[in-house]
């Protein structure tokens, strides 16, 4: 059994606890394929200022030999807050991919403060590398996006876990004090984020490579992962 997977599972549990402490858990009735996605576990939360927080883990089952965690937190469309995203992909011996961002949906004071905190938190991480992003990603992610192609067990992994917890805690604490303003409407920006994420060819090919049928993948991506606000 991989020690790395055990550490990452512990991180996922800690993050779930943070979400449950700050938000209200709910069942997502659009997630209709729970039995068709072996090894997948999806959790959902919401609050007055968070319309959907989603944490998903995928265990190495069947064709899939990797462990994955995906987090997206979408604020209310009436809040001056970025979208929070975190993805971790690991093989049994190393973390092979990390992406994390506070992605702007509104040019406002709260978003600027939150992005400044993000910048300060990630700027000195030695394993954080600037990556050339595809056009769909450049349109939605911030210039300070955290990205790594390899994080080694030990000190680097400890830093990653600590950073993930810090960025999640700060985001959730901020969400409870950011004012709700009906003159703000970030529907278009949030929908653009979801539409652009769906342009990621790796997203689709990686799910299909796990042996998930195309129709199940499409329903999940369009209605659970990145559904647009109608």
PLM features: residue spans?
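Short Lys/Arg-enriched alpha/beta "domain-start" segment
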Residues: 1-79, 83
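Intrinsic-disorder-associated interaction segments
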Residues: 1-8, 12, 107, 153, ...
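Generic detector of well-ordered alpha-helical segments enriched in charged/polar residues
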Residues: 9, 13-16, 20, 115, ...
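Detector for Asparagine
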Residues: 22, 28, 48-49, 64, ...
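Extended, non-transmembrane interaction/recognition domains
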Residues: 68-189, 196
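Alpha-helical oligomerization segments
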Residues: 169, 173-230
């Amino acid at each position: 059994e991989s020690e790395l997977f055990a550490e990452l599972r512990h991180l996922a549990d800690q993050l779930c606890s943070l979400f449950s402490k700050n938000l209200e858990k709910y069942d997502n009735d659009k997630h209709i394929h729970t039995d068709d996605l072996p090894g997948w576990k999806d959790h959902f939360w919401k609050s007055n200022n968070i319309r959907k927080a989603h944490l998903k883990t995928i265990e190495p089952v069947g064709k899939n030999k990797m462990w994955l965690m995906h987090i997206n937190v979408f604020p209310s469309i009436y809040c001056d807050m970025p979208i929070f995203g975190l993805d971790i992909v690991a093989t049994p011996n190393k973390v092979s991919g990390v992406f994390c961002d506070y992605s702007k949906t509104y040019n406002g004071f709260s978003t600027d403060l939150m992005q400044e905190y993000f910048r300060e938190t990630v700027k000195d991480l030695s394993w954080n590398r600037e990556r050339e992003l595809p056009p769909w990603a450049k349109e939605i992610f911030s210039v300070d996006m955290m990205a790594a192609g390899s994080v080694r067990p030990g000190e680097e992994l400890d830093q990653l876990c600590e950073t993930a917890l810090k960025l999640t805690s700060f985001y959730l604490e901020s969400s409870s004090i950011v004012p709700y303003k009906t003159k703000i409407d970030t529907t278009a920006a949030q929908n653009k984020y979801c539409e652009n994420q769906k342009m990621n060819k790796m997203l689709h090919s990686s799910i299909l490579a796990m042996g998930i049928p195309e129709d199940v993948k499409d329903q999940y991506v369009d209605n659970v992962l990145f559904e647009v606000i109608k």
